[in-house]
């Protein structure tokens, strides 16, 4: 059993055309610097197209985003990640206000008045530790990670450690957004 890193309250508001979601969390005393804070959605694999309004159109992180324009971008989910020899996180997009995943006939959208980061991937980040070498097998699902906060990449391997402003150090974190599922 894994002990939660945060005490949190998750609220849903059901409307005619959307579900409003708000999350408030307080970090537990023993937690230092988690890699990210957000929610994970598991969708059917057929949600394989992504359109978003945010930084892009390549992966970016809080400390690796400043040369990229905020605009509207479209990608295949399978093309939004980099396959490293040693499995690790990739494909994050920052400063987003909207992300939509599409199947042939449906759309799953997240819209927020506040910037968030997201990752759309056929891999579950929880599986990375199980593999010492490149992950060949995908989940058979589309995973959508919505992050209120995420840690920067840094350069500790060959330079200075990650600056504190790019770490998840907040004692309390809030995020809110609307979920919309509709026909395409």
State where each predicted segment sits:
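Beta-strand/loop-rich accessory regions of lumenal/periplasmic or secreted enzymes
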Residues: 1-184
